[in-house]
Amino acid sequence: MQANDITFFQRFQDDILAGRKTITIRDAAESHFKPGDVLRVGRYEDDGYFCTIAVTATSTVTLDTLTEQHAQQENMTLGQLRQVISDIYPGESQFYVIEFKTL
């Protein structure tokens, strides 16, 4: 069985498959992805494969510089996005935006 390259919490799977979630915001541990990368995507909870994505762009962001556009690309409000990022990465300040499309 082939390993997954990136995982998402299961709660985001439907939004990714429907094209409602088109970015992911990660910490430095996952800052190595670059435009053109094709990634196998799995669920964080069980590592089950559910789609393949292509990275279309990358950029850096801080919690304070997140915008409404980031929130729309995550299919959340800006307040929800800031809370989710703070919950997943407590104490972190520098993040990496990975824009993608499903293949």
Curated annotation (Swiss-Prot):
Gene3D superfamilies per UniProt: Hypothetical protein (2.30.130.30)
EC top class, as a word: hydrolase
Keywords: Hydrolase
Gene Ontology terms, MF aspect: hydrolase activity, acting on carbon-nitrogen (but not peptide) bonds, in linear amidines; N4-acetylcytidine amidohydrolase activity
GO cellular component: cytosol
ASCH domain residues: 6-100
InterPro entries (alphabetical): AC4CH, ASCH_domain, PUA-like_sf
Protein name per the record: N(4)-acetylcytidine amidohydrolase
Family per similarity comment: Belongs to the N(4)-acetylcytidine amidohydrolase family.
Pfam families: ASCH (PF04266)
Reaction it catalyzes: N(4)-acetylcytidine + H2O = cytidine + acetate + H(+); N(4)-acetyl-2'-deoxycytidine + H2O = 2'-deoxycytidine + acetate + H(+); N(4)-acetylcytosine + H2O = cytosine + acetate + H(+)
Coiled-coil blocks: none
Annotated EC: 3.5.1.135
Active-site residues (renumbered): 21 (proton acceptor), 24 (nucleophile), 74 (proton donor)
Function text: Catalyzes the hydrolysis of N(4)-acetylcytidine (ac4C).
Organism of derivation: Klebsiella pneumoniae subsp. pneumoniae (strain ATCC 700721 / MGH 78578)
